[in-house]
Amino acid sequence: MKKIINSILAFVTLFSVTSCDLDMDPETAIRPEDAYTMEYCEGVRGYVYVDLKALLSGGFYSTPDLYVDVLNVCIGSGNQGIYSFNWRLYPTDQDVTSFWSSYYTTMMHINYAIRHMDAAYEYLTPDEQKKVDVYKGEMYFFRAYVMHRAALLFCEDYDPDKAADQLGLPYPKEWEPEAKLARGTLAKLYENVEADLVEAEKTVTAQGTPTDQIYLTKDAITAFRAELALHLHQYTEASQYAQSLYGTYPLVTTAEGLERMWREDTSTENILQLEVLRTTMTTVNSFGSYLNSSWEPNSGVYFYAPTYIPAVSYRHLTLPT
């Protein structure tokens, strides 16, 4: 009996000590000495790439397209997206608030990544520091890109003659989740965008090729500069940026090439294509509204029944003349 009691006491003591250790240093927490490693820097970088995949899919495309009459609602839509289609969006609408929240949550993650990489820098080897310099450059680019995307939805169209008076958006540059930032002007917003692009170009120097570009390259920054210059009415610069990429990324000119691009992800047009695998499909929003179909066993074909289709006026813009 005495041996049994002693064994029980020993087990209870061991269990108590183990529980205490887990309370002090739980297995799911990151230990302070592990937070300043290359692995963690890669982790916060990867988290931002996941955010970007979400922002570049699903409703972030279909809702604005519905609102500006690029898409028409089909009979089988079940009124999905009807408020956008009928121009009945309000500031309290779920689509509007979720877009705002998603953009600024991504900004928070970007600024956290920059702050953490700065804190970890002195603990890294010289080779690791070079990689982190590139990662930080990516973060500066994504900050500029996300704010431009948000401005397209929440600001007036940029007018060079009025930008100093047009309302911009808060442009957070530090990881301060509770900060209350002023909107500023649209001119100031794009000054910040330009400053972040300059920082990105200092370290993101890999040129890129049309195959398997799942991380940011110099060419992707150039492509964004072309889009940005067009938006800012800098037409000569927009043309120059775009022309500098034509030779490396020629447009697909055949039906077979177009099919390979959409079915096999093989194309000469791809400047940057964020990686999505079967195991990471949950990190992107669905494009099912464009692709809904059902299998008809009697006829042996798929019945295509999209929620939306491109408007006739928009299709005419894309057809050869």
Question: What residue ranges belong to the model's regions?
Answer:
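Sec-dependent bacterial lipoprotein signal peptides
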Residues: M1-T18
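Membrane-proximal, proline-rich intrinsically disordered regions
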Residues: C20-Y67, A242, P306-Y308
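Hydrophobic-face positions in mid-chain alpha helices that act as interaction patches
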Residues: G43, Y215, H233, E237-L317
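Conserved, well-structured interaction surfaces
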Residues: Q80-F154, G184, K202-T205
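Inward-facing hydrophobic residues that define packing positions of alpha-helical scaffold repeats
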Residues: M107-I110, Y190, L197, A242
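Short coil/linker segments at helix-helix boundaries
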Residues: Y123, D127-V132, L153-E191
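Structural signature of alpha-solenoid helical repeat junctions
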Residues: E128-K131, Y135, L189, P210-Q213, ...
